[in-house]
């Protein structure tokens, strides 16, 4: 009978479990839940860092491409300005030269259109207040005709993309005349 009662005890799942064993199991469950939460948090953090790194690399790649395009186009600014100056003199030439100039002017406009499509625009400086972020003062002129710090002449145009200058304008800036010293004549 003892064998059958032992058999009966192992088959009965409703045997009482000691309290300390329940507490140990509950503690183990709590520990496992905490570890799972910690690992899940780390996983989410690594996933977010990975996504941020991907976005950062994509942005850097776009910026590098943009700067490469800008640098390539900047190299065309001087020849384009030279062509503009040369075309300015064409009106004083023969009709044949004027016809050639008309064709070159069309090409020049195509270059300018490409610049505009890439976001590169020239900005006007004459009459504006000198801004060291947009202008390089290569000369000054004493005058009372305009306020001090006003740009009176532009030697080369400035260009920018959006609000960021890619080449500053070279300008002449007005400055107030120096006060004249009175000569003292002693006799």
Curated annotation (Swiss-Prot):
For this UniProt record, give its keywords in alphabetical order, as a comma-separated list: Chaperone, Cytoplasm, Stress response
- Tell me the subunit arrangement: Homodimer.
The UniProt regions of compositional bias labelled Basic and acidic residues, in chain numbering, are: 1-11
Reported function: Participates actively in the response to hyperosmotic and heat shock by preventing the aggregation of stress-denatured proteins, in association with DnaK and GrpE. It is the nucleotide exchange factor for DnaK and may function as a thermosensor. Unfolded proteins bind initially to DnaJ; upon interaction with the DnaJ-bound protein, DnaK hydrolyzes its bound ATP, resulting in the formation of a stable complex. GrpE releases ADP from DnaK; ATP binding to DnaK triggers the release of the substrate protein, thus completing the reaction cycle.
Pfam families xrefs:
GrpE (PF01025)
Which residues lie within the region annotated Disordered?
1-21
Q: Which domain of life is it from?
A: Bacteria
Q: Where is the signal peptide?
A: none
What protein family is recorded? Belongs to the GrpE family.
What the entry lists under InterPro entries is as follows: GrpE, GrpE_coiled_coil, GrpE_head
What are the recorded GO MF terms, alphabetically?
adenyl-nucleotide exchange factor activity; protein homodimerization activity; protein-folding chaperone binding; unfolded protein binding
Q: Does the keyword Metal-binding apply?
A: no
Q: Name one GO biological process term.
A: protein folding
Q: Answer yes or no on keyword Cytoplasm.
A: yes
Q: Where in the cell is it found?
A: Cytoplasm
Lineage of the source organism? Bacteria, Pseudomonadati, Chlamydiota, Chlamydiia, Chlamydiales
Q: Which GO terms describe its cellular component?
A: cytoplasm
Q: Which PROSITE patterns match?
A: GRPE
- Record-given protein name: Protein GrpE
Q: What is its main location?
A: cytoplasm
């Amino acid at each position: 009978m003892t064998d059958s009662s032992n058999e009966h005890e192992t088959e009965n799942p409703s045997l009482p479990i000691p309290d300390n064993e329940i507490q140990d199991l509950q503690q183990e469950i709590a520990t496992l839940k905490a570890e799972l939460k910690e690992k899940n948090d780390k996983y989410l953090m690594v996933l977010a860092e990975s996504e941020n790194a991907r976005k950062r690399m994509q942005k850097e790649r776009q910026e590098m491409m943009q700067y490469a395009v800008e640098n390539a186009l900047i190299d065309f600014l001087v020849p384009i300005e030279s062509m503009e100056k040369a075309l300015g003199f064409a009106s004083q030439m023969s009709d044949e030269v004027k016809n050639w100039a008309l064709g070159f002017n069309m090409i020049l406009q195509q270059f300018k259109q490409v610049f505009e499509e890439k976001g590169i625009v020239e900005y006007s400086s004459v009459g504006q207040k000198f801004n060291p972020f947009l202008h390089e003062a290569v000369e000054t002129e004493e005058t009372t005709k305009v306020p001090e710090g006003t740009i009176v002449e532009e030697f080369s145009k400035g260009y920018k993309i959006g609000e960021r200058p890619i080449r500053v304008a070279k300008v002449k800036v007005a400055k107030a005349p120096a006060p004249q010293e009175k000569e003292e004549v002693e006799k």
